[in-house]
């Protein structure tokens, strides 16, 4: 009887864990292993002004996503203040968020503006985003709360950025 209750509890706990990880995966742009930014070190964007590949052995979890780091010092800085280093819009394309969509990113296409990390889908998309950067950030900030928990496939892009 005790084994049955324990098993039931473990199954229920596992279901809750997987549900929370699945939920978080919709809120952050991750690979199949749950890694964000394709394994690039989130802190390096700020300290080195470039995308530096991190190591799986030096990692931290934030908002359901696994972050890799190029050094323990960077990991520790991230853990001390993850909201400072985590990419905006869950690591989805900043331009996409501005038009109400979630697109994957190329983590080497980025900008740090006002101490916030923005990543985009490609160099071409980044050019579009840069041309209307202030408006794009304002729109994305406004829209993110309503699209954050919606899966990418359920969203339809709009043309608000073109107005």
What are these regions (language model features)?
Residues 10-11, 140:
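Generic hydrophobic, helix-prone segments enriched in Leu/Val/Ile
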Residues 23-163:
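Charged, low-complexity intrinsically disordered segments
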Residues 19-21:
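N-terminal signal peptide c-region/cleavage motif recognized by signal peptidases
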Residues 1-10:
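Bacterial N-terminal signal peptides that target proteins for export
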